[in-house]
Swiss-Prot record:
GO terms for biological process: defense response to fungus; killing of cells of another organism. It is found in: Secreted. Keywords: Antimicrobial, Disulfide bond, Fungicide, Plant defense, Secreted, Signal. Its main location: secreted. It comes from the Eukaryota. Belongs to the DEFL family. GO terms for cellular component: extracellular region. Residues 1-31 form the signal peptide. Disulfide bonds join C37-C69, C44-C60, C47-C67, C51-C68. The lineage of its organism: Eukaryota, Viridiplantae, Streptophyta, Embryophyta, Tracheophyta. This is Putative defensin-like protein 79.
Amino acid sequence: MKSEKSADAYGTYFLLISTIFLLFIARQASSYQMLICLDLNISCADCQKQCDETSYGGMCLNGGRTCCCKKSPPPSYYDPRPPSS
């Protein structure tokens, strides 16, 4: 009896940790996919300029008919080596 309760406790603990981990990964993945798209007929250069003023850059889709602005920052990468003195 004691071993069954122990196994159930470990199973519940594993399920809880797995759920938290998966929710964290899903949130991280979705945070880099936030785009606001406007159906504008402007050049790609104008799209980039307009998006740079209000967000973290833009991209043209459908040959410039759709302008999408990125609303979340790109990932940051840091060099693990300290700067040389």
